[in-house]
C-alpha cells in the first residue's frame, strides 16, 4: 500500500505524476475545486467582515469522500495543485476538508510535468502561502458581490438571465466603445501617387514624398493635379541613397496572452480552444516507450522568464541544428508578475514537433509546434536586414523607394511573429545604383482613398487590449470573452465582435448606475490591489470593504431609480402552425430560434433555417440549408431531413462537375476559396 497521498486537479495530471513517483505514492484527482460559494445565494456575509460561506460543490460529495478515505490511510498528504493563486486556493480548501495542520509543509509546486521537475518538487515541499489564497478569495468574493448584486437588478428591470461582472462588463465596454467610434467616424478624402520605375532591367516602385523639399498633403484631386502637371517627361534623378543595416530581434517566448493572440492569428483557434489544448499538453501526453510526459510548461503565466537549464538546452540544439552563427549571445531577461513562473515553452527542446507528431492530435500538434518554434526562435540570433531608401527627384517633386533584403536570416529561419510579416518595402527589390544616375518612370498612378474607421475587435486584438490595459489576469481572458458571447451581448461576425442590441442596453444601464464597474482605471487599480494582497502588503478584507461601501449605495440607487426596459422580441415573419399566433425570434444556448409569441399557452418552437438558393443534389426536391453544429461549426443539409440525409461541410454552389457530374462545392482555406468537385479531382481557379 502507498505511504503517501498526492492530490492534483485532473486525472490526466494524476496519471502522469504517479508514473514518476513510484509505488510509495498514490496520486488522485480532486477534479478541480471541491469547495466554492453557494450558487443559490450570495454566500458572503457583508455584515460579518465579509466572511465567505464555503460549501462542497454539488456533485463533489463522492470525490470528497474518496479523498478523505485515502488521506486517513496515508502517512503524508501532498497537495500538488497548479502553481498559481487558483491552485493555492484549491490546496487550501483541500487542507481544510482533510483537516491537515496549517503548519504542515505539504504543498508541492512544479512549473512543468517532467520526471526531474516533479521529483525535485517533492524534495522541497512548503506550507500553503495564505497571501496567494487571500488574493484568490478577494477576487472570488469581489466577483460574487458584483455579480449577485447587479444581476438581480438587471433581471427585474431589463430581462431575466442577464449578468454583469467586474471584468466582463469592461470587456463589453471595449467592444461597444469601438462600435461607437465606427458609427461616429467621418471618412476623409486623401490621395496617393505611386510610380513604377525602371533602371536597366530592374523594375521597382516608389511613392510621392515631398514637393519643394516639404511634405505636401494630397487631400483632393486638385492637389494631385498640382503635382502631376509639374512632371516633365519620364526621367528622374537619384538624389539620395541611404543604406542601413537593421537588426531584428526575435519575439519573447509566449505568455498566456501572446499565445492566445498568435494561436488566433496563425491557427484560427479561439482563446478557449487554445487553453484547452495547452492544458492537455501541460498535463501529459503518452509517448509510448518514453511514458507519459508533460510537453509544455504551465500555461497560465504573465512571465517571459526562462530557466538557465531550458536556455542551455535550446542553445545546444540550435548550435547542432543550425550552427554557431545562429546562437544568441543575449542573456534572457524575461519579466512578469508571477516571478515563480516561466514563459510557456516546451519542457524539452529535444522533443521536436516532428518527433511528437504521431503522439498528438492534429490540433495538439499545431499548438505544440507554435509553442516550440516560438521558444527556440526566441533563443536564436537576430536577423540582419539591409535596408535601402532611394529618393528620386524631378522638378522639385520627390518620390521615395524603400527596399530591404535579408542579409542573415537568424531566428527568421524558424519562426516569424505574425505582425512582423507586413513591412513596407520588403518585396521591393531596388537596383544597385548611385546618386546622380537617372531612372525611368514607366507609370505614375494617382489613386483616391478615404480614411477608414478603426477595425472591430478580433478575439486576438481583444485579448491584447485586455492585457495592455491590465484588465483581468491570464486565466480570465478566455472565459470573459466566452461569457459575453454566451450572454448574447456580442456576436462574432466574420471573426470580429459586434455588440448586440441587448449588449448595448445592458452596458448603458451598468454605465449609468455602476460607473466604477466599467471604468478601466478602476479595474486596473483593483488588479493592483489584488497583487498587493498576494504580496502580503494589504489585507484582503480591507480591499473588499473599501469597494463595497460605495458599491452598496450604487445598488440601492439602481433598485430605486432604474427604469424598466421592455425588449421586444424580433418578429419572425410567419405564424405558428399550431395556434396561428405570430412567431418571434428568441436567443437560446446554441443561437437564435423561432418560438410562438403565445408562450406559455403554446410552446411551439422551430429552428431558423437559412436557405442558400441551391436545390438538394441528392433528393432533388428539398433546398440546401445552412445549419450549425453544437460546436457552432457551419454545415449544409437538406431541408427535407430526416427524409433526406444529405449533409456536407462545404457549401454546394448549384452546379455539377463537368468531369463526373457530381455536385460542386466552395471550399474555403483562410481568406481564399476554391470551387472543387465533391467527388473527383476537378478544381477551378482560386478566388481571393
UniProtKB/Swiss-Prot annotation:
Mg(2+) binds at residues 9, 82. Gene3D superfamilies: 3.40.50.140, Bacterial Topoisomerase I, domain 1 (3.30.65.10), Topoisomerase I, domain 2 (1.10.460.10), Topoisomerase I, domain 3 (2.70.20.10), Topoisomerase I, domain 4 (1.10.290.10). Residues 322-349 are annotated as: Disordered. One of its GO terms (biological process) is DNA topological change. One of its GO terms (cellular component) is chromosome. The active site is at residue 298. Its EC number is 5.6.2.1. Monomer. This is DNA topoisomerase 1. It comes from Staphylococcus saprophyticus subsp. saprophyticus (strain ATCC 15305 / DSM 20229 / NCIMB 8711 / NCTC 7292 / S-41).
